[in-house]
């Protein structure tokens, strides 16, 4: 009886902690599945994460102007710059700074010379991104894990390592999603 009570007490004490472990295991498995389904190698996937982190650090250190909002997205060494900067000169400086990184193969500089985006506009962009991703999940012609979706000021940018057919299907899905003003493909094609 004492053993049963001790076991029950231990279970009650450890139960909440074990739930966290399950989330870590499940989350780790889901993340592993995403990487396994990605066309990039694990090394390239990690390099892309490093590019995004290093670029963000460089931008925050080198460009301290108020009103700047720069996002860096990397996919297979192709870098997409989105957001707002105060001048054309800074737009070019940001590109030059990021182009100096050894892991960067190509840059799509889509920075806008404009004031910083409002929170309402950012929320709208997040909703558009979610809608496009949801629609891609339900599209047979596109493996949604192969396409990265970024939205800035109602413009949807699509990146990925895809066939021409997958690219066109993804573009069609994004273009017909509510709230999308324009679609800009930045794909690397697997079927040259």
Which residues make up each language-model segment?
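N-terminal targeting leaders
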Residues: 2-7, 12-15, 20-192
């Amino acid at each position: 009886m004492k053993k049963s009570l001790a076991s029950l007490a231990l279970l009650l004490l450890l139960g909440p902690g074990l739930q966290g472990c399950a989330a870590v295991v499940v989350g780790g498995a889901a993340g592993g599945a995403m990487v396994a389904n990605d066309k990039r190698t694990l090394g390239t996937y990690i390099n892309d994460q490093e590019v995004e982190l290093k670029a963000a650090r460089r931008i925050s250190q080198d460009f301290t102007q108020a009103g700047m909002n720069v996002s860096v997205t990397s996919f297979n060494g192709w870098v997409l710059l989105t957001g707002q900067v105060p001048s054309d000169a800074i737009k070019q400086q940001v590109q030059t700074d990021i182009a100096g990184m050894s892991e960067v193969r190509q840059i799509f500089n889509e920075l806008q010379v404009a004031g910083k985006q409002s929170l309402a506009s950012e929320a709208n962009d997040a909703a558009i991104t979610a809608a496009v991703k949801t629609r891609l999940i339900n599209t047979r012609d596109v493996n949604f894990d192969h396409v990265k979706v970024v939205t800035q000021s109602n413009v949807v940018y699509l990146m990925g390592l895809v066939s021409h057919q997958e690219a066109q299907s993804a573009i069609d899905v994004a273009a017909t999603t509510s709230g999308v003003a324009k679609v800009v493909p930045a794909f690397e094609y697997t079927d040259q």
